[in-house]
Amino acid sequence: MYLERLQLANFKNYEELDVDFSNNVNCLVGNNGVGKTNLLDALYYLSFCKSYFNPVDSQNIRLGADFFAIHGHYRLDDKQSAVQQLNNQQPTTNEVTVSCTLQRGQSKKLKYNKKNCTTFAEHIGRIPLVIVTPSDQNLIVGGSEVRRKFIDGIISQVDKSYLRQLLDYQKALEQRNKLLKQFYENRYFEEDSISVWDEQLVRYGEPIVAARKAFLDEFRPLFVKYYQLIHPDAQTTEPPTIGYETQFGEGTPTMAEQLKANYRRDAQLQYTTIGPHKEDLQFGIGEFAAKRFGSQGQQKTFLLALKLAQFEYIYAHLGSKPILLLDDVFDKLDMQRVSQLVLLVGSDRFGQVFITDTQQGRVESIFEQAPEMPHKIFRTENGELRTEN
């Protein structure tokens, strides 16, 4: 799959834009603050119905305007076209259009092939996309919620039933926590009432844990492969690892048993202390935790390997190569790793790629090493794009 044409109106700093892209590598170059990242965010909107950077949709409307509109014209590969036809998601054509619009004071609207989407969740996975940004460093150094969101987001793109289980689990968790707070405030505890929500948590939570374990079994080898491709010496000097921190390992009590055993503690704390919402991933480099002891370069390599493994996992399960967005990823990497990364993502194993950089000369020097690689370079200035090659 690739994006042929993008049209923007009043999106962030873009008043109006109509641009065609290469189906291979697209580089957006320019100073900081001129709109490179904003354009990538528009692509993210078309895949996930939301911004990657700003959760308040209305704040993405250009200053002084009353609406924004994002229109994408995509071309599917033959395999994905056949799959979507089988699922009645599109007409018998390789062309797909996606539109996301927002009028101030109204609800956001999403259209797929000119038909309104009844829920945003039904759209997830139709336009697979992987994004890497400087803020993703929180995946390494941030709290456990960021890492859970990472794996949940990947699985949800390829498994709609998993997404429904997550949503149902979250609803049950909110109700159980609300009940625990009432117990605390009213100084009483009623086991029959809370057991109703225990049953819901177990019903949705156990499949979530099982799916995460199965995902990691498949994901780890992909991650190690890409880490070593970016950093060939890692196999002997700093082998990377991903550990799974769960309350439900082999030989532990069941989720139902643990929920019941923690009634008193949960009532005192007013929230549920047991469940998949408490799980975490442990990232290691050699014998040390990447979060505490990894250098900035090592952490950046770790992050890139996670994201490229995400790309291959989604491709393997959906049969279509996700669009890959690399936003300002060259910082903290030496020129050798930068070259290895660009040559890697520009190879046949990947599909359409968007790269932002402040240094045009840097990306041009890399393409000189691979003149046969199809690519476009765009100069970005104040909400406008100009082709440089």
Give the role of each language-model region.
Residues D327-V329:
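Walker B catalytic acidic pair
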Residues G72, Q352-Q359:
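Structural recognition of the conserved hydrophobic beta-strand(s) that form the central parallel beta-sheet
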Residues M1-N31, Y45, Q85, Y188-I323, ...:
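Conserved NTPase motor "head" modules and their coupling/switch loops across ABC/AAA+ ATPases, GTPases
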